[in-house]
Amino acid sequence: MSAESAELKVAHLDADAFYVSIELRRHPELRGLPVIVAGSGPRAVVTTASYEARKYGVGSAMPAARARRLCPQAVVLAPDFTTYREASREVMEIVRAHVERVEVVGLDEAYLDLTGLFSPRAAMRRLIAEIGARTELTCSVGIGPNKLVAKVASDAEKPAGFVVLTREQACARFAQAAPGLVPGIGPKTAARLAELGLTTLGAVGAAPESALVQRFGPNLGVELGRRARFEHDGVIGAARKVVSESRERTFDYDVSDPAQLRESLQTMTDELCASLHAHGRSGRTIGIKIRLDDFSTATRAHTIEAPTNDVERVTSVALRLLAEYAPARPVRLLGVRVAGLTSDAPVMLAVSTDADAAGDDDSNEVLDQLSLRV
């Protein structure tokens, strides 16, 4: 085994603007133009946008109406999830022909175990070249000693990036980056870190563990410090079966207005159903979660006859459950969930990367959320 292969154990491969790139294969005349893939309904959300559209602030999960306002000249295409799943299978078949152990974490991304490869860099160069030649898709690759370094590296120079980092190099390169660069540290967690004066990854990584533990508890406090130092022990394994998917929102202030609660719930069901549709998943049990201002928590669920990922169906059930519960106190957190999922498609395990968005529950639950993607 070479010294390189001993240090560089994991690659993260991420297809660039996956849905848009597939559409551009069918519509090459649109190359170089701002393109948005989104539904056409009044509450449709963006599934992905070309890099030309992203320059205008358009991003995934954004309401399509807002995306059109930000970039009125964009070409908007309806999503074709059947074609996207077929393209994903094609890409992952190529990946598995090059690397024995692969953990698929989405239609467009996977972790690859590079252990035993004599030259990981050369192997990954050959892989992305073959993917490009056979599918006309570009991929960004990050290579490192663990999944966390590989993931952040693959995002660093998109599109068509190829970044190789040791853990020490990652610490140096991203020392001045905001904590939210690292999966598992979302906006609310970053705000809580800022209250301690910790506004960069370098500062979080160098902070006394006791200070983090005092603020976040023994499990999350230790984990945040480790992630900021790009320390990670997760192993690459086969994708686990997902049995449910959810969206939750912790409000900036307690909400009593029923109309605002309904609007928030509708937005979350839009995002949730777009993800279910994208990954070929449907479920029978639809539920809501409500946490009140006194931190009491209630859940309500209803099981329908046949699995669905239809946004109108899921929204209808979720809104009915909310109306039946009729919270008597202001609401701190609201969530929606679809369970009993069935799917043959590759899975995306995580939904939330923010500790606070995960529901202000105990640290063990938060850590479960943080560990899903990396």
Question: What residue ranges belong to the model's regions?
Answer:
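DNA-contacting surface of Y-family translesion DNA polymerases
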Residues: A3-S5, F174, L181, T189-L333, ...
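Extracellular/lumenal ectodomain signal focusing on beta-strand-rich modules
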Residues: E109, L333-G335
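Gly/Gly-Pro- and Ser/Thr-rich, intrinsically disordered tail segments characteristic of DNA damage-repair
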Residues: M1-E223, T342-V374
